[in-house]
UniProtKB/Swiss-Prot annotation:
Belongs to the thymidylate synthase family. Bacterial-type ThyA subfamily. This is Thymidylate synthase. It is an enzyme of class 2 (transferase). GO terms for cellular component: cytosol. It comes from the Bacteria. It is found in: Cytoplasm. GO terms for molecular function: thymidylate synthase activity. Its EC number is 2.1.1.45. The keyword Translocase does not apply.
Length: 264
């Protein structure tokens, strides 16, 4: 994934110094675009180790509509712990917005079910969109959505996905985000009997935290390996029934991990 290293280099060279919510400070560029052809490999970075099971479990957690960290903690994943309350809740974040968007007139909308229905029944629709940016719920969320909106597009039985991410922690968060939405695209393509096409990522405030600069400079010196291949072992009856063991990542060769602290 040379494109990821190109982004790191751009931020290190051209990024603007900005203050931020965490108090750490960032180097930031605004407006960035990358495309990944999912037919050519699964876009999980190889210039440091990424924990694929954590990516899978977080996505399955979103798809469950869950907003409590217990499921993640039960699978030894603690990435959401800093924002949870004493009971483990995070407020109406991604999972609730994806699966249970509440309307003013009392309806509850399952956006994931809706997009799958549209892909199957009206693949030419320009409305195959999921949003996590529920303005009326933002004040109740422990952490506001960073990856806020994604859209699917079907051409010649091929499924494409585009994500808009308003705020992006490039060193720690972006590798997870790219892999997570690429995995979701594979899953929905399988459910809808389509082939996978491109995953397109668009970022707003795209930044390196200043306590990640040293690590980024180390990473850009590494040479990427060939991308791994994703194999899905079975087709569940619906997208909400996938399990970790349904996914095999073949030939994932990677450089050693690079430790960095998350900005809270």
């Amino acid at each position: 994934m040379k494109s990821y290293l190109v982004l790191l280099k751009k931020i290190l060279k051209e990024g603007s110094n900005r203050k931020d919510r965490t108090g750490i400070g960032t180097l930031s560029v605004f407006g960035y675009h990358m495309e990944f052809n999912l037919k050519l490999g699964f876009p999980l970075i190889t210039t440091k180790k990424c924990h694929f099971p954590a990516i899978v479990h977080e996505l399955l957690w979103f798809l469950k509509g869950d907003t409590n960290i217990k499921y993640l903690n039960d699978h030894n994943i603690s990435i959401w712990n800093p924002w949870a309350d004493e009971r483990g809740y995070l407020g109406p974040i991604y999972g609730e917005q994806w699966r249970s968007w509440k309307t003013k007139d009392g309806r509850v909308i399952d956006q994931i079910d809706n997009v799958i229905h549209l892909i199957k029944n009206n693949p030419n629709s320009r409305r195959i969109v999921v949003s996590s940016w529920n303005v009326g719920d933002l004040h109740k969320m422990a952490l506001l959505p960073c990856h806020v909106l994604f859209q699917f597009h079907v051409v010649d039985h091929v499924l494409h996905c585009q994500l808009y991410q308003r705020s992006c922690d490039v060193f720690l968060g972006l590798p997870f985000n790219i892999a997570s939405y690429s995995l979701l695209t594979h899953m929905i393509a399988q459910q809808c009997n389509l082939k996978v096409g491109n995953f397109i990522w668009t970022g707003g405030d795209v930044h390196l935290y200043k306590n990640h600069i040293k690590q980024a400079k180390k990473q850009i010196l590494r040479r990427p390996y060939l991308l791994p291949k994703l194999v899905i072992n079975r087709k569940p009856t619906q997208i909400f029934n996938y399990l970790l063991q349904d996914f095999n990542l073949l030939n994932y060769k990677y450089h050693p991990s690079i430790h960095a602290k998350i900005a809270i």
